[in-house]
């Protein structure tokens, strides 16, 4: 798990801190099994970009517009389309605030360690995610 595992690393740290986290892997549709009506759904993943270690954030419809146009996910082939379809078939998700937090990576590589650029992005991504969670509490 090289840089493309940054979402898993962040998720596991959030889980360690007591937050509800589900690892979906490459199957966005497994969200249907684990979603229980939470007000907010935050998807965290590595995204391909030119500059590794940049934290990107999209909310609501911007996820579909900007993510497709600007950055493609390192894991989910067609994740944007899959998520849009999921919102159509699962009525429960229509009321949830949807958020996407990504950390850019240059390219997925085999390996066990994160690059320094991506490691340095984790605290910024965590801070952003925690602010999303706290917003409106």
Swiss-Prot record:
A molecular function (GO) term: endopeptidase activity
GO-annotated biological processes: protein processing
Pfam families linked to this entry: HycI
Protein name, UniProt field: Protein FrxA
Organism per entry: Pyrococcus furiosus (strain ATCC 43587 / DSM 3638 / JCM 8422 / Vc1)
